[in-house]
Amino acid sequence: MSSLQPTLTNERIGVLDVLRGMAIFGILFVNLAHFSYPDMYLSMLGKENFFMDKWSEADFAAADILKFFIQTKCILLFSFLFGFGMVVMMERAENKGKRFVPLYVRRLMALLLFGTIHAFLIWDGDILTEYALLGFVLLLFRKAKPKTLLIWAVSLYLLFSIPFMLTSFDQSNGQEWVQAVTQQAKQAIHVYGSGSLKDIAEQRIHDRLVYMSSNGMLTYNPLNYFFASIPYFSMFLLGAAAAKSRYLHEPEKHRKGLKRLWMAGLVIGIGAQVLYSVTDKEICLLIGAPFLMFFYVTTVVYLYHKTRVRTVLQSFSAVGRMAFTNYLMQSIVCTWIFYHYGLGLYGKVYPAAGVLITIAVCAVQMVFSHLWLRVFRMGPFEWLWRSATYLSWQPIAKKTKV
């Protein structure tokens, strides 16, 4: 019996790497706001705040475009692919006669360690820790049938959405609160833009703890945290359902279902996003984001199986194969660009310029990923992660042909 090893190139589902590469780039377009200015605090203040007063029309246009097409959609896509990946890994382990649960627990523990280091030592906006913690809950659903996973996913998502349907969530606050949050934002601009390494480290930890408080991590009530994370977890379940249904393995056998999903994504996704742009109601985003995400997925799946277009889409494949490395490198590069220990541009770059910086970083990552994978089988952080998962150092260099 052959030993269980990480998925190799010839065993991969090509369109997944393309989708993963697109998702990791889309996430950077959204995350750049948090890299370059105190977006977490400014979002609490709403549209009327001291920082947005400096924006030009181009900045507002750039922010609106990102909000319409990318915000929330790409992180939901990445969550969908996470759930999909668990099933692929489980099926492969079972085919090799290996126990899956211990393997996946080690994988999640390693991810949790990486995420914690990332969150407190590099960038406070880390999502890896949440994925790792939710991954343990996902394990409970590993044997569920696709229909069961679908029912759970939809039910949980509706449970999360109901409060937004029943109330307008008036976020008006007293003047003292506004002044306190404004001061927090100004402090972040000062520290990240001109502070010492010690100051930046303390600010990063402070901001991370604020974030963890806002999403329920620090309430010491797992239910509070899980409720705040339902959108991600629902996509985990949908991804697992799609993998078990073989929707992306064998798309030609699911043409009708994929076409219906494409139409629903187009009509409902675009329609809800238009309403969100006009009304700014969160419920419209909650409806529109997953549908628009599935519109993107089905469009890419369809185009990927068109020979001429596949060549273009495959340019994202190397990025997707190194998604873990690229995600972490985005944090390392962008904090260097914006924090004082690097170029010190924090608080000086607005959305329009931020889009250009994002495009430049993505272009460099695409070239780097292609060059790296010419020599190596996987990215450097993928190598560390998989070595921890399989409890042995994995071969990383490609075998040279004699």
From Swiss-Prot:
Taxonomy, superkingdom: Bacteria
Pfam families given in the database record: DUF418
Transmembrane regions: 13-33, 68-88, 108-128, 149-169, 223-243, 261-281, 283-303, 327-347, 353-373
Membrane topology: Multi-pass membrane protein
Protein localization: Cell membrane
The keyword Zinc-finger is annotated on this UniProt entry: no
One term under GO cellular component: plasma membrane
UniProt entry keywords in alphabetical sequence: Cell membrane, Membrane, Transmembrane, Transmembrane helix, Transport
Keyword Isomerase: no
Described purpose of this protein according to its UniProt entry: Involved in transport.
Name of the protein this chain belongs to: Uncharacterized protein YxaH
